[in-house]
Amino acid sequence: MAVPKRRMSRANTRSRRAQWKAEKTELVGVTVAGQRHKVPRRLLKAARLDLIDLDRR
């Protein structure tokens, strides 16, 4: 693992952290029990197997 050679200032640390931005998850259409829903891609299998409640939104 990389170890910093010198201490980084608080301002530099915070400005570096500010570069990271969360991305919006893309929703994919899925048909469950004749109804069309939009879910994140990682939840497609769970939605098809009826493991998650899609009507709670």
UniProtKB/Swiss-Prot annotation:
Single annotated GO MF: structural constituent of ribosome
Compositional bias ranges of the Basic residues kind: 1-19
Region listing for Disordered, in residue ranges: 1-20
InterPro entries reported for this sequence: Ribosomal_bL32, Ribosomal_zn-bd
Record-annotated disulphide pairs: none
A Gene Ontology biological process term: translation
tRNA processing as UniProt keyword: no
Span of the signal peptide: none
Keywords from the UniProt entry: Ribonucleoprotein, Ribosomal protein
Coiled-coil stretches noted in the UniProt entry, renumbered to this chain: none
A cellular component annotation (GO) from this entry: large ribosomal subunit
Protein family membership: Belongs to the bacterial ribosomal protein bL32 family.
Protein's name in the database: Large ribosomal subunit protein bL32
Native source organism of the sequence: Mycobacterium avium (strain 104)
Gene behind this protein: rpmF
